[in-house]
């Protein structure tokens, strides 16, 4: 059985996300890995509306927005050296990296 790794990368800042994705792809190409992506996933927008005053002026409100950008990279034919290389990479504080390993029947 083969193993595929799905790498989900999330960030609030788009420039940090692109830098992280570029770093991932460069490291993976250097190790001659078969990969698909980076695939741009839909951006998630969250909006929050709060009252400015705690007691009066219901019409006076503030709006806040939080945008989360996401990318997906799929690695085919996982090797132990690639897994060590992936876990050893470090990224900026605003980037979240999620690794999932799936078994693929051949």
UniProtKB/Swiss-Prot annotation:
User: One GO CC annotation, please?
Assistant: ribosome
Give the residue range of the signal peptide: none
Query: A GO BP term, please?
Result: translation
Could you list this entry's UniProt keywords, alphabetically sorted: Ribonucleoprotein, Ribosomal protein
Gene Ontology terms, MF aspect? structural constituent of ribosome; tRNA binding
For this chain, the family text in UniProt reads: Belongs to the universal ribosomal protein uS10 family.
**Under what name is this protein listed?**
Small ribosomal subunit protein uS10
């Amino acid at each position: 059985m083969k193993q595929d790794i799905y790498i989900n990368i999330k960030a609030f800042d788009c420039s940090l996300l692109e830098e992280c994705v570029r770093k991932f792809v460069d490291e993976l190409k250097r190790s001659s890995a078969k990969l698909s992506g980076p695939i741009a996933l839909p951006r998630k927008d969250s909006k929050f509306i709060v009252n400015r005053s705690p007691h009066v002026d219901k019409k006076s409100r503030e709006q806040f927005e939080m945008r989360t950008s996401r990318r997906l990279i799929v690695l085919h034919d996982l090797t132990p050296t690639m897994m060590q290389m992936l876990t050893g990479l470090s990224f900026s504080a605003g980037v979240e990296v999620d690794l999932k390993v799936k078994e693929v029947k051949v």
